[in-house]
Amino acid sequence: GTYEVWNRFLAPNTFWHAEKRKFLRIGVSPLSNQGKLEWHTEIKNGTQYFSINKVENIDIIEENVLAIVDEAKKQGVDILVMPEMLGSYHIRKSVADKLSEFPENDESYPALTVLPSIWEAHQNTVIVLDEYGDEVIRQEKQHPFMLKNSEEGNCLENINPDRKIHLIHCEGIGRIAIMVCKDALMKDYLHMVLTVLKVTLLIIPSFSTGNYNFKEIIQYCRVADCCAFWINTCSVAITMGLDDKKLKNIGFALKAGKRPNDPNMENGLFLCERKSQGCENCGIAGCNQCMFIHDLVFGKGG
């Protein structure tokens, strides 16, 4: 199929912190294990569809999101990424209000904040805000997810994609694109984004029971010299009735390109591993401020 490409050009000094310190700091957060999705199903033309009614505990999620934004500011994160499905327009407003205030102590909010996607009116939308709380892009999910073996049998996500791909261009970084969960698993679509649109930084917010599919993406991105960040959420467990101990890897960072070697990087791939006693980076019961930080060194070919 055909897609319309929308280009958004950021000011050349958007990532001035990163340029000064010679690396880009990316924070990915699974947010919470408390975001339970409530949905309903309907049958149209012989196909069963599901639609999201609401996220239960949305107030807890909102607190988490605001705490993560604060943590990202303290840690000097340039791009903050959150998972799929757990967002709302109210959260978008709360975050925008927070970003619009001047931070203290010479700190800065992330240059880009990728909010948890919002499922509303048959659209699954990721909104990206700049450090002042202004909207950069809205990327809609283009490929519906098939919910398998739910109580009602297989159900297809009831979305009406807009067939638009938003590219964020920035000097020194290249082209940034967002692929919402299933979008990244569609080989033709991924191939087009990597080889035709020549994206250099791919962000994949997710709400998924398995990470096995996402490993295929790594090979594609590596060949295309594209860095990729995938983040899932621990809330999958409560929604899908899973034992959350089975969610071992909750995200990954792929640092592609010819970069200085980093001792923490195995083949340029870093897995965000959950620890069974709680999340690795905070140790707070109820995992309110979990964030994995990855630094991308500006290198030759990077």
Show which residues each predicted segment covers.
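Active-site catalytic loop in hydrolytic enzyme cores
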Residues: G1-R21, E120-L197, E216-I217, G278-I293, ...
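N-terminal, active-site-proximal structural segment of metallo-dependent hydrolase catalytic domains
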Residues: G1-V77, L86
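Residues that mark the start of a beta-strand
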Residues: K22-G27, G174-R175, D225
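A structural signal for short, well-ordered beta-strand segments and their strand-loop junctions
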Residues: V28, M82, T113-P116, V128, ...
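CN hydrolase (nitrilase-like) catalytic-core segments centered on the catalytic cysteine
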Residues: D78-I79, L86, K93-T113, W119-E120, ...
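Short, well-ordered beta-to-alpha junction loops that form the rim of enzyme active sites
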Residues: E84-M85, C181
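C-terminal, beta-strand-rich globular interaction domains
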Residues: S108-V114, E135, L147
